[in-house]
Regions:
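N-terminal secretory signal peptides that target proteins for export/translocation
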Residues: 1-7
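Bacterial N-terminal signal peptides
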Residues: 9-20
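Flexible loop/hinge segments at secondary-structure junctions
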Residues: 24-341, 346-350, 356-360, 425-429, ...
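Short coil/turn segments at beta-strand junctions that form active-site/ligand-binding loops
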Residues: 25, 222-223, 365-367, 405
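Hydrophobic anchor at the start of a short beta-strand
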Residues: 236, 369, 406-407
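Short loop/turn segments at strand-loop or loop-helix junctions that form parts
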Residues: 337-338, 371-376
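Conserved C-terminal helix/tail region of periplasmic/extracytoplasmic solute-binding proteins
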Residues: 357-362, 367-372
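Periplasmic OmpA-like peptidoglycan-binding domain that tethers envelope proteins to the cell wall
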Residues: 364, 374-439
Length: 439
């Protein structure tokens, strides 16, 4: 049964509101500070301008990290609330029907999915929407000579087991830790990808609600190290990060967009599926459109609009792979998979459409594509080869069903990993299909 709140807003959108109810917000977005600080207001401003044809103004509510966007629609006032108090607060608001859209800088947890199961499946394509990619940047002072750390060493630093920069190749100086607060999806992501249940954050860490404030403080502290969304890196220096034996990578346009960077993460909007607010679904479609993704790029995050890159020569790449791709550019898309080994995930389903649009815009066809599947390390090399081939075939079949016939697809087994072999996170990242396009 629709809530009273949703019913009143339906009345508002029909312009039959009773006196005294005109202050109801047309939409409410609650959750991640990473999304809500800048990205969500920018996206909503663009959406409202397109919807109404009128200017949009932003004003504070009097509560920290909250913004109201105001415009008029058919002569009536229209407002949208963006409340950016952390990912977990957004789920609570969505579950309580106090929010139409939950902004999350991590994926929905199993317990959260179960709690909402009677209203919507939050992992379904109708409810789960990847809107951008962010790199969880590891920040140090610009003068710090340390260039890279592996994830285990990074975890030991944040746990306080490594407490002096000289232990990791830096100056003889104590390490000061800066971290996001407990309500933050950024913290949840760091805890999952770095601490990984093996380490606890040192009690001496300074905690922050704001990415930007954390980054600013690290950039002014020669002893400091912290983490924040890539868009909030500011004047801090970025470290390259290695996952296991995989190469260390800095967050860059290609490494983050393809999610090859070990600390790349997806930014999500969640809705109550087809039972949710229709205006929210319109907003989601706007965000996923080329116009919306251009705003994502403008905000400093990584859009999902594909672009092609000529990769420089790399001596670590096997000769067979170099010959396979010598006439191709790397596209900034990796197809990844859901629970099944060959089932494309929700982002990949959208990416199929984006790749198809890229081909149309660039005057190319499926014959110009090369899909290269990869697998995590398996019990037998032939098994990894088979899984990688099935993944490439799965992506080629999905494109063919959309009218794009891909002639070039191949499996490359467990070679060229981008994540630690054998672990859950590494397995998700290593199990991928790279997209290459003929020059």
């Amino acid at each position: 049964m629709p809530s009273i709140r949703r019913y009143l807003r339906h009345l508002w959108l029909s312009f039959t509101l009773l006196p005294g109810l005109a202050s109801a917000h047309a939409l409410e977005i609650h959750g991640s500070n990473t999304i809500g600080a800048t990205l969500a207001p920018m996206l909503m401003t663009g959406f409202l301008q397109q919807l109404t044809g009128n200017p949009v103004t932003a004003r504070p509510t009097g509560t920290a990290n909250e913004t109201v966007l105001a415009t008029s629609y058919n002569g009536k006032p229209m407002t949208v609330l963006v409340a950016a108090h952390g990912t977990s607060t957004g789920f609570s608001a969505l579950a309580a029907d106090h929010a139409d859209i939950w902004a999350a800088s991590r994926r929905v947890k199993g317990s959260e999915r179960e709690a909402m199961a009677t209203r919507a499946d939050l992992t379904s394509p109708a409810s789960e929407h990847v809107i951008a990619i962010d790199g969880l940047a590891i920040l140090v002072h610009p003068s710090n000579p340390v260039e890279q750390l592996n994830i285990d060493t990074l975890a030991r630093v944040f746990a306080g087991e490594i407490s002096n920069w000289s232990e990791v190749g830096g100056p003889d100086r104590p390490i000061r830790i800066y971290a996001r607060d407990e309500q933050s999806g950024t913290w949840d992501t760091f805890k999952e990808l770095v601490l990984a249940g093996r380490y606890n954050l040192t009690p001496s860490a300074q905690r922050y609600e704001s990415n930007d404030q954390l980054s600013n403080d690290v950039s002014n502290d020669p002893s400091g190290i912290g983490f924040a969304g890539f868009a909030s890196a500011g004047n801090s220096k970025l470290l390259a990060i290695a996952d296991g034996n995989a190469p260390a990578l800095k967050p860059s346009a290609l490494s983050v967009a393809t999610e090859d960077y070990p600390l790349a993460r997806r930014l999500y909007l969640y809705t109550a599926g087809n039972t949710g607010e229709p205006l929210a679904r319109q907003f989601i479609e706007y965000v996923q459109s080329p116009t919306g993704q251009a705003i994502v790029a403008e905000s400093g995050f990584f859009p999902q609009t594909p672009f092609a890159v000529d990769l420089p020569p790399d001596a670590s790449v096997p000769d067979t792979f170099r010959r396979l791709t010598e006439h191709y550019q790397r596209l900034s898309v990796n197809f990844r998979f859901a629970e099944g080994r060959t089932q494309l995930d929700n982002k990949a389903r959208r990416d199929l459409q984006r790749v198809q649009q890229y081909l149309q815009d660039s005057g190319k066809t499926g014959r110009d594509l090369m899909l290269i599947g990869f697998a995590d390390q398996q019990s037998h090399e032939l098994r990894a080869q088979m899984i990688s081939e099935l993944r490439a075939l799965s992506a080629a079949k999905a494109l063919r069903e959309m009218g794009t016939r891909v002639q070039g697809y191949v499996g490359y087994g467990h070679y060229m990993p981008v994540g630690s072999a054998g672990g859950e996170s590494g397995a998700r990242r290593n199990g991928r299909v790279e997209v290459w396009v003929r020059r």
